[in-house]
């Protein structure tokens, strides 16, 4: 039996929860069975804790020899326990990685993180950069590359028309100064394009530029169906000249889910040239890679309607893959093949 373990999700405004929920639906469609308790949505932390704990406790009793269990990582507190119990029951474990704590929040050392992940028989990683990092840190099991996070939201993108010299760039996600200080630098810059900000945590009183507009939080489905932007920006950190700091440098390993959201919006993306996701952006022809945000002025000035139409056509084709969950399906099937 192929199976997965659901748990409590407090809300779906957090990128990690959105992605995990999409993956659960993809696995259900692939015929996977949930061996934990049903998915719950308790906002109360105590209720959520006990709902997840109860689900973890039933997992060992529902596993059998030869089963393949997919876990979405990180799992607070229970990951190692679930892996060990699965192996005792004769099951194999596939771990689908969403975040590496040792590289993002630095709460774990690489050694501790790899010790945990060493309990898994196979891993699904974001990209080739993360695959190399995992291998260099000693992992010996099978590894499949996710390529890009699927985004299966049931929404249809708005129709976009490219007007020369009238570029609107969408930036959606966490907007706090701690994670994205670069936004405050943009908010005080003279720009030849508009920046449309969607999300929580931005101090709009700091906006001095007439080209930066803060819209607050909007649901992903509404953003997909209603935005009228030209590009989606994938950038983190404290500088407009490079993705720096803990969050910025993490882009060298991480595939931000906002990239997939922009693709579902039918927006070509602008990404940092050193970001791991740049490999897929170039391969699929779905955007442009820049060294600095100061390069955007040149892009806006030089891109032709024909060039934009070609990017958008590629984006629309790739959007179909993400909506149907094909990246996740392919990666899981690779791991299942490895575990035969």
Where are these regions (language model features)?
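N-terminal pre-catalytic "stem/leader" segment of glycosyltransferase-like enzymes
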Residues: 1-90, 272-277
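Nucleotide-sugar donor phosphate/pyrophosphate-binding loop at the beta->alpha transition
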Residues: 51, 100-115, 152
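A short, active-site helix/loop in glycosyltransferases that binds the activated sugar's phosphate group
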Residues: 105-108, 118-143
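A charged, aromatic-enriched C-terminal amphipathic alpha-helix characteristic of glycosyltransferases
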Residues: 147, 160, 291-298, 304-340
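Conserved catalytic-core segment of nucleotide-activated headgroup transferases in glycan assembly
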Residues: 152-225
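Nucleotide-sugar-dependent
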Residues: 224-265, 271-274, 278-279
């Amino acid at each position: 039996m192929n199976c997965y373990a659901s748990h409590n999700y407090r809300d779906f405004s957090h990128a990690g929860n959105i992605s995990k929920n999409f993956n659960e639906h993809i696995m259900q469609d692939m015929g996977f069975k949930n061996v934990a308790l049903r998915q719950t949505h308790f906002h109360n932390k105590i209720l959520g804790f006990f709902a997840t704990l109860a689900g973890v406790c039933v997992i060992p009793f529902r596993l059998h020899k030869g089963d393949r269990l997919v876990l979405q990582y990180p799992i607070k507190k229970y990951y190692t326990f679930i892996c060990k119990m699965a192996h005792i029951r004769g099951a194999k474990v596939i771990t689908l990685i969403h975040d590496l704590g040792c590289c993002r929040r630095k709460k774990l050392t690489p050694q501790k993180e790899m010790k945990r992940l060493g309990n898994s028989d196979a891993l699904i990683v974001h990209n080739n950069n993360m695959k190399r990092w995992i291998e260099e840190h000693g992992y010996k099991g099978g590894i499949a590359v996710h390529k890009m996070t699927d985004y299966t939201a049931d929404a249809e993108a708005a129709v976009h028309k490219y007007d020369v010299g009238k570029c609107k760039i969408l930036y959606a996600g966490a907007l706090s100064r701690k994670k994205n200080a670069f936004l405050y630098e943009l908010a005080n810059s003279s720009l030849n394009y508009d920046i449309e900000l969607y999300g929580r945590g931005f101090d709009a009183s700091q906006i001095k530029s007439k080209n930066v507009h803060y819209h607050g939080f909007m649901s992903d489905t509404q953003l997909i169906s209603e935005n009228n932007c030209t590009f989606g920006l994938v950038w983190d950190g404290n500088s407009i000249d490079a993705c720096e700091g803990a969050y910025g440098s993490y882009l060298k390993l991480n595939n931000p889910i906002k990239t997939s959201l922009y693709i579902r919006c039918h927006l070509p993306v602008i990404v940092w040239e050193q970001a791991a996701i740049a490999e897929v952006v170039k391969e699929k022809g779905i955007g442009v890679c820049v060294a600095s945000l100061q390069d955007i002025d040149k892009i806006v000035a030089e891109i032709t309607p024909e060039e934009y139409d070609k990017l958008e056509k590629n984006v629309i084709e790739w959007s179909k893959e993400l909506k149907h969950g094909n990246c996740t399906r392919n990666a899981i099937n690779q791991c299942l093949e490895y575990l035969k």
